[in-house]
Amino acid sequence: MSKVSGSNGGDSKNTLYCSFCGKSQHEVRKLIAGPTVFICDECVELCMDIIREENKSSMVKSRDGVPTPQDIIKILDEYVIGQRQAKKILSVAVHNHYKRLSHASKGGDVELAKSNILLVGPTGCGKTYLAQTLARIIDVPFTMADATTLTEAGYVGEDVENIILKLLQSADYNVERAQRGIVYIDEVDKISRKSDNPSITRDVSGEGVQQALLKIMEGTVASVPPQGGRKHPQQEFLQVDTTNILFICGGAFAGLDKIISARGEKTSIGFGATVVSPEDRRVGEVLRELEPEDLVKFGLIPEFIGRLPVLATLEDLDEDALIQILSEPKNALVKQYQRLFEMEDVELSFHEDALREIARKAITRKTGARGLRSIMEKILLDTMFELPELEGVREVVISDEVVRGAARPLYIYADRQEEKANASA
């Protein structure tokens, strides 16, 4: 049976030492004793860090030492509900990215070009979350950048080289590793051209950024300031080749569905044409018909679209998908709040109808999965405020009436057999 020693007290004769780092029990917070050895809390934390790093890159590998698309999508499925096609495209892209790097190291006559990806989908459908989940499960440097903060060189804001700087930081400034990394650029629809006439004014945060991104996305040797750019003009620059860096761009492209629908209406003229009202079709359904010309009309320049050969559209999340998002993934919202309540020794439970009502509210707000947390916070706010002061509460039950605001959460007390509704206002 192991014992735990604190850091206070004891004379020098009976002082215990960590068998790994050699620190005494007085130099650490805790010392855990085994049959013949001791380990301190600092060494335990170090071991946990090593295990986490091992787990991060412990995916099943194919014969070439490359993570298989099936394995990548299997891990994505644990965290992200739905969007099967987008997950398939991302899994294949990452798999091919590894293979291309492996092929480049072996040499050969055929040079494998990279296929950058554009993710298009309505807000709250999981574009950014897919990228964040991908970052956790791959073992190449990965960084996320926000396109809204970028400006053309020479203007107030971030240079596009700052994206490569973030990738360098995620690779601990190892240039070789950074050159094999993956970059996700979010909110790329916000850098669309502000006007159809390019000669009206200089568009430093729109078309100017697209022009600046062209070369690093295609492949160039970028000069990256290690201290972050314009504030330190005397610093030496690091040279990073972006040829093998995979770029994934994502955006909601609000209004793109109307451009696609308008194009469809032009081609559906005549007595035999099938007329479908735009209001009868969901955004995700319309986006499936996306063509590069629609993105040009939206405000992306043709050269920028040409650097993103793979187009992946994401679906709207329906009621059933939102219910699954609430309860099924490893870090589902319901599980997160249940863990919060467990810290107060209280069980939190939701009726099935309550989850369905939450999903309906999110659909009404048109915020997708992103709106689920704000709805949950509003429902549970009063309960989380009162609970620390209440004694004997064993369980809190949320019904559909609670979600609609027609009732209070049900409090079940440990010292009573009957269920007691919370009467306080």
Curated annotation (Swiss-Prot):
<feature type="domain" description="ClpX-type ZB">
    <location>
        <begin position="6"/>
        <end position="59"/>
    </location>
</feature>
<keyword id="KW-0479">Metal-binding</keyword>
<dbReference type="Pfam" id="PF10431">
    <property type="entry name" value="ClpB_D2-small"/>
</dbReference>
<comment type="function">
    <text>ATP-dependent specificity component of the Clp protease. It directs the protease to specific substrates. Can perform chaperone functions in the absence of ClpP.</text>
</comment>
<dbReference type="GO" id="GO:0008270">
    <property type="term" value="F:zinc ion binding"/>
</dbReference>
<feature type="binding site">
    <location>
        <position position="21"/>
    </location>
    <ligand>
        <name>Zn(2+)</name>
    </ligand>
</feature>
<dbReference type="InterPro" id="IPR046425">
    <property type="entry name" value="ClpX_bact"/>
</dbReference>
<feature type="binding site">
    <location>
        <position position="18"/>
    </location>
    <ligand>
        <name>Zn(2+)</name>
    </ligand>
</feature>
<feature type="binding site">
    <location>
        <position position="40"/>
    </location>
    <ligand>
        <name>Zn(2+)</name>
    </ligand>
</feature>
<dbReference type="InterPro" id="IPR004487">
    <property type="entry name" value="Clp_protease_ATP-bd_su_ClpX"/>
</dbReference>
<dbReference type="GO" id="GO:0005524">
    <property type="term" value="F:ATP binding"/>
</dbReference>
<dbReference type="GO" id="GO:0051082">
    <property type="term" value="F:unfolded protein binding"/>
</dbReference>
<keyword id="KW-0547">Nucleotide-binding</keyword>
<dbReference type="InterPro" id="IPR027417">
    <property type="entry name" value="P-loop_NTPase"/>
</dbReference>
<feature type="binding site">
    <location>
        <begin position="122"/>
        <end position="129"/>
    </location>
    <ligand>
        <name>ATP</name>
    </ligand>
</feature>
<keyword id="KW-0143">Chaperone</keyword>
<dbReference type="InterPro" id="IPR050052">
    <property type="entry name" value="ATP-dep_Clp_protease_ClpX"/>
</dbReference>
<dbReference type="Pfam" id="PF07724">
    <property type="entry name" value="AAA_2"/>
</dbReference>
<dbReference type="GO" id="GO:0140662">
    <property type="term" value="F:ATP-dependent protein folding chaperone"/>
</dbReference>
<dbReference type="GO" id="GO:0046983">
    <property type="term" value="F:protein dimerization activity"/>
</dbReference>
<dbReference type="GO" id="GO:0009376">
    <property type="term" value="C:HslUV protease complex"/>
</dbReference>
<protein>
    <recommendedName>
        <fullName>ATP-dependent Clp protease ATP-binding subunit ClpX</fullName>
    </recommendedName>
</protein>
<keyword id="KW-0067">ATP-binding</keyword>
<dbReference type="GO" id="GO:0051603">
    <property type="term" value="P:proteolysis involved in protein catabolic process"/>
</dbReference>
<dbReference type="GO" id="GO:0051301">
    <property type="term" value="P:cell division"/>
</dbReference>
<comment type="subunit">
    <text>Component of the ClpX-ClpP complex. Forms a hexameric ring that, in the presence of ATP, binds to fourteen ClpP subunits assembled into a disk-like structure with a central cavity, resembling the structure of eukaryotic proteasomes.</text>
</comment>
<dbReference type="InterPro" id="IPR003959">
    <property type="entry name" value="ATPase_AAA_core"/>
</dbReference>
<dbReference type="Pfam" id="PF06689">
    <property type="entry name" value="zf-C4_ClpX"/>
</dbReference>
<keyword id="KW-0862">Zinc</keyword>
<dbReference type="InterPro" id="IPR038366">
    <property type="entry name" value="Znf_CppX_C4_sf"/>
</dbReference>
<dbReference type="InterPro" id="IPR010603">
    <property type="entry name" value="Znf_CppX_C4"/>
</dbReference>
<dbReference type="GO" id="GO:0016887">
    <property type="term" value="F:ATP hydrolysis activity"/>
</dbReference>
<dbReference type="InterPro" id="IPR019489">
    <property type="entry name" value="Clp_ATPase_C"/>
</dbReference>
<feature type="binding site">
    <location>
        <position position="43"/>
    </location>
    <ligand>
        <name>Zn(2+)</name>
    </ligand>
</feature>
<comment type="similarity">
    <text>Belongs to the ClpX chaperone family.</text>
</comment>
<dbReference type="InterPro" id="IPR003593">
    <property type="entry name" value="AAA+_ATPase"/>
</dbReference>
